Amino acid sequence: MREGEPFGVHLDTPNSSNAYNVRNVNSDGTLNNNNAYNGNRGVRPLRWKMRSSRHKPKAEYHHQRKVYPAAAIHSGGKYRIADAGAFRVAECKGYIQRGFFMTDYEKIYNFENLYRAYRKARQGKRWKGAAAKFEVNLLEALNLLSYQLKTKKYTLSPYNTFEVFEPKRRVVMSNSYKDKVVQHSLCDNVLEPILTRSFIRDNYASQVGKGTHYGLDRLQEFMRRFYRKNGIDGWILKGDISKYFYSIRHDVLKTLIREKITDPDVLWLVDLIIDSTEGNVGIPIGNQTSQLFALLYLDGLDHFVKEKLGIKYYGRYMDDFFLIHHDKAYLQECRKQIEAFVQARGLSLNAKTNIFPLKHGVDFLGFHTYLTESGAVIRKVRRRSKNNMKRKLKKLAALHAAGRINAKTVEQSYQSWRGHAEKGNSYHLIRRTDHYYNSLMKPKEAAQCQKH
């Protein structure tokens, strides 16, 4: 073994006397050039000096057991070893970890992370003009974004404001394509890993592995557990925050974020996004960051209900939440305390917030879920969802008849709703809606085929 070469690996010419072209190493580190079996044959490089594990911290011993690629790049007196896309600098003698890590802010403007963010931002939008324009000069655009973020010369473009009317009227503020890329990088690499650490399991919105169907399954599970313990005689408090996104106070939000994030550069970018709207209240519905900010804003309420009020069966999806309990009077007291909590953050409960018998069920995430006398949990698509889908199908069929969209677009929209409806007890509803869909689309498709 030559001086300056790490124990267990040799990176020069292979062993010519060995049929497998692998250089063997004796237990003392010297080369073994014979063809006999050697227990140290093909030893992978070690990152740590050869010493007993009892002398190492627990975390260090865990890293020692990692398998690293045998190929290392020799550079002067050091080797750089690839590990999950990052570089770890190791000294030749013993692979002592010296570490090369990016700060949270560097993760945001790192070129590879910006490229991944661009790929996420373009999903389902490549046909749009803004996405196509950004993609024409992709490398130049990403390099410019990286430079602007690094030097803090980055600014947000004006929002594109429009209204949507389903499921209810809302004002949406859509940001520019470059800002979408930045926010994807910010959320994926910094905000989501840090902010979601304190979230309870039953916070369902905008998180990997969760969502509407997960929330519905948890509600169903809670109802079954409650029935096994208390029977059908129970109550459910269904709550809703009035104009939630438009009522979030900037100063309170910034304080909550600073309790979890300390990097001043990240906080500069976060403040820039929060203050991008007029006034000191409200965050844009169209921003990706707004989803995480909204989840964080009521994270304290989740812990308050679970830990202070002692409610076992509780769940929240953004600004909609429910509490299940056997005592109606206690739920009334919970409502008062929840109202006081949200008012301290500049919010108010919707007038629809009320307490219902558990057997009457609750409207949550597009379904009406209720408990029967036998303990079965039934989940039905809400009437409003049915009517909205019929109106949407009629509108899409008219656009298809006018030649503005193709049949595949209509089918994809309908299949999306159909998949959602299948999560409930909706067999007969789906059959009726299938018939309605076929009556709108199939005759037109048959007529087009006859023309050709």
Q: Each predicted region: which residue ranges?
A:
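Right-hand nucleic-acid polymerase module
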Residues: 86, 175, 180, 184, ...
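C-terminal, surface-exposed recognition/capping segments
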Residues: 1-57
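Ala/Thr-enriched low-complexity intrinsically disordered regions
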Residues: 13, 30, 59, 70-72, ...
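Conserved polymerase palm-domain catalytic core
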Residues: 141, 148-149, 217-318, 322-339, ...
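Conserved two-metal-ion catalytic palm core of "right-hand" nucleic acid polymerases
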Residues: 54, 66, 74, 83-253, ...
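Active-site-adjacent bridging/hinge elements
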Residues: 17-25, 153-164, 269-277
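Aromatic (phenylalanine/tyrosine) cluster motif
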Residues: 7, 37, 61, 68, ...
